[in-house]
């Protein structure tokens, strides 16, 4: 390819970034040592950039205002865009180093702590429903009362999501994490004082606090992944953060039937078993709150990706929470995703809440196996989540993957519905696992797809709205499916969910895939976001600009 010539005059069209004072730098130069070689000799005008001391600044000024000059000798002229302020300065001006991108080892600690206290919160959500008949007999209340111990998680989320996301956007990640972990711990201790048959209201109070804690937990996976992890691992990190919540649901399906067996004839033993479960949960929640206070940091020293560097460079006063909400609701693809995510996740919440009742309808006395089926459903979903996260990091095929998983979840729900009453419980284990693999595996897909199509809006806000939609659909689906199950049997309730999931497939197919964050990370910018050129050891190779006589005029 020909080198740039020495003709005077503007070689770049007005309005292009090169016309605003960008310097072409040799692609192979290491960070901090890039150089521009002027025309008057091999080292006549060479100067390092990226914050290092400069030589021949006057010569550098000539590059900006004078004739086009060739770069350092290379077979081809390959350059990446560097703001002129970083490479050439007026005499006496202070150097302005470029923002660096790097990965912090602490990111794994932050992810682990979050995943663990999210696990405990999810465990407390499902610990009543999976042994609903036991708590129904102990407290002397109806099944609807026990269902509300689960649905209060969904109910509390809807009105509190907006102040919670505002807090996350304005006060930061650490304070939000402390509130989530702290309220989770407090709610667990309150429930320890409810182990008497007339104190159902106390256990409801503790569960309400845990449900408020959930508001400060569910919106964090995509924010933690974006703030702490590089572009090649962000989807996997998000899936891992969601995995903690799913694992908590799995443990909630497994442990309560084992720790609190159905001993209605011995109330004292039953109370002792419930107390053991509550105190054990409180001890773990307390330990995790302490770890959160010690080790959970706001953000790493350096941004992990080009997209985060661009966001951190934006002036804070330009951010408006109300404007961000309006932008999200004007984004038609996001609105469609909001509905489809709510349908899928709401169906999962409903199935999880009513699983014990569905199983006991056809398999009397199988409380323990009902918990194991729930465990199978969630563990299979955990595998699905990780595989989907790895697949997204590798392919970036967000819409295609989301649509395929949605279709397979629908097929799994249909199979589960029509095999539940075959009287072979092993079949329910298999179909429950298939359903969980795709239905639970969908959860991180929705988060990451939302971040992609709404960038640069806050990840916490988009995730929070997705979760609010899930809670609303979860309440409606649980009430409707519970009523249908009581009046007509589990099959009627499950068919109700199948119809809604089919609608979700149609709406998912209509979503336009605009991967804004991914485009920033690979160097493609749009009018809304300015990418900051900074090297990262894990980022994709920076895009290059090939300069020649023909390409200069074509730009």
UniProtKB/Swiss-Prot annotation:
Record-listed Phosphoserine modification sites: 56, 536
Residues with glycosylation annotation: 265
Effect of residue 328 to P: In NEDMISH; uncertain significance
GO molecular function, one term: heme transmembrane transporter activity
Ranges of the Cytoplasmic topological domain: 1-99, 171-172, 229-233, 296-331, 396-397, 454-461, 513-555
List of residues binding ethanolamine: 214, 471
Record annotation: effect of changing residue 241 to T: In RETSNS; likely pathogenic; abolished localization to the plasma membrane, leading to decreased heme exporter activity
Binding site for choline: 471
Pfam families named among the record's database cross-references: MFS_1 (PF07690)
Impact reported for residue 409 to P: In NEDMISH; uncertain significance; decreased choline transmembrane transporter activity; severely decreased ethanolamine transmembrane transporter activity
Alphabetized Gene3D superfamilies for the sequence: MFS general substrate transporter like domains
Mutagenesis or variant effect for residue 168 to V: In RETSNS; uncertain significance
Extracellular topological segments: 125-142, 193-199, 260-265, 363-366, 421-423, 488-489
Effect of residue 245 to A: Slightly reduced transport of choline and ethanolamine
Stored InterPro entries: FLVCR1-2_SLC49-like (IPR049680), MFS (IPR011701), MFS_dom (IPR020846), MFS_trans_sf (IPR036259)
Disease link: Retinopathy-sensory neuropathy syndrome: An autosomal recessive neurodegenerative syndrome beginning in infancy with areflexia and retinitis pigmentosa. Nyctalopia (night blindness) and peripheral visual field loss are usually evident during late childhood or teenage years, with subsequent progressive constriction of the visual fields and loss of central retinal function over time. A sensory ataxia caused by degeneration of the posterior columns of the spinal cord results in a loss of proprioceptive sensation that is clinically evident in the second decade of life and gradually progresses.
Functional summary from the UniProt entry: Uniporter that mediates the transport of extracellular choline and ethanolamine into cells, thereby playing a key role in phospholipid biosynthesis. Choline and ethanolamine are the precursors of phosphatidylcholine and phosphatidylethanolamine, respectively, the two most abundant phospholipids. Transport is not coupled with proton transport and is exclusively driven by the choline (or ethanolamine) gradient across the plasma membrane. Also acts as a heme b transporter that mediates heme efflux from the cytoplasm to the extracellular compartment.
Protein name per Swiss-Prot or TrEMBL: Choline/ethanolamine transporter FLVCR1
Taxonomic source organism: Homo sapiens
Gene: FLVCR1
């Amino acid at each position: 390819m020909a080198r740039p010539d020495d003709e005077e005059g503007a070689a770049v069209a007005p309005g292009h970034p090169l016309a605003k004072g960008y310097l072409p730098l040799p692609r192979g130069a290491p960070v901090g040592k890039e150089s521009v070689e002027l025309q008057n000799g091999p080292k006549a005008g060479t100067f390092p950039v990226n914050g290092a001391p400069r030589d021949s600044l006057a010569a550098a000024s000539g590059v900006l205002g004078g004739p086009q000059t060739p770069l350092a000798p290379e077979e081809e002229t390959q350059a990446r865009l560097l703001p002129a302020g970083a490479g050439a300065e007026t005499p006496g001006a202070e150097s302005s180093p470029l923002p660096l991108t790097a990965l912090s080892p602490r990111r794994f600690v932050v992810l682990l702590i979050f995943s663990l206290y999210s696990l405990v919160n999810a465990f407390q959500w499902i610990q009543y429903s999976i042994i609903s008949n036991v708590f129904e007999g102990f407290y002397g209340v109806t099944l609807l009362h026990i269902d509300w111990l689960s649905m209060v998680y969904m109910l509390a989320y809807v009105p509190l999501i907006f102040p919670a996301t505002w807090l996350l956007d304005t006060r930061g990640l650490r304070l939000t994490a402390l509130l989530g972990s702290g309220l989770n711990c407090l709610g667990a201790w309150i429930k320890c004082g409810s182990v008497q048959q007339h104190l159902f209201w106390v256990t409801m109070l503790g569960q309400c606090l845990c449900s408020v804690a959930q508001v400060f937990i569910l919106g964090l996976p995509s924010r933690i992944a974006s703030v702490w992890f590089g572009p090649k691992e962000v989807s996997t990190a998000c899936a891992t953060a969601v995995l903690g919540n799913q694992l908590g649901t799995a443990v909630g399906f497994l442990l309560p039937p084992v720790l609190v067996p159905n001993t209605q004839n011995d109330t004292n033993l039953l109370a002792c078993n419930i107390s053991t479960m509550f105190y054990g949960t409180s001890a773990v929640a307390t330990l995790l709150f302490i770890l959160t206070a010690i080790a959970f940091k706001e953000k790493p020293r350096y941004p992990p990706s080009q997209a985060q560097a661009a966001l951190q460079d934006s002036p804070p006063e330009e951010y408006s929470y109300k404007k961000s909400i309006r932008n999200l609701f004007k984004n038609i693809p996001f609105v469609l995703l909001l509905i489809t995510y709510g349908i899928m996740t709401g169906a999962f919440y409903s199935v999880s809440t009513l699983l014990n009742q569905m199983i006991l309808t056809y398999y009397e006395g199988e409380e323990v196996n009902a918990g194991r089926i729930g465990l199978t459903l969630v563990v299979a979903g955990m595998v699905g989540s990780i595989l989907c996260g790895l697949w997204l990091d590798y392919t970036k095929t967000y819409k295609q993957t989301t649509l395929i998983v949605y279709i397979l979840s629908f097929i799994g729900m249909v199979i589960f519905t029509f095999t539940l009453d075959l009287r072979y419980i092993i079949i329910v284990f298999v179909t429950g696992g298939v359903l969980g693999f795709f239905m639970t595996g969908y959860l991180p897909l929705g988060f990451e797809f939302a971040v992609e199509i709404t960038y640069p809006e806050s990840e916490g806000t988009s995730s929070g709205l997705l979760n609010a939609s899930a809670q609303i659909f979860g309440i409606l689906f649980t009430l409707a499916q519970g009523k249908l199950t009581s009046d007509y049997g589990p099959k009627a309730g499950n068919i109700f969910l199948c119809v809604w999931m089919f609608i979700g497939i149609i709406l998912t197919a209509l979503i336009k895939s605009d991967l804004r964050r991914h485009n920033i990370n690979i160097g493609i910018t749009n009018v809304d976001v300015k990418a900051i050129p900074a090297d990262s050891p894990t980022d994709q190779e920076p895009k290059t600009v090939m300069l020649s006589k023909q390409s200069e005029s074509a730009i």
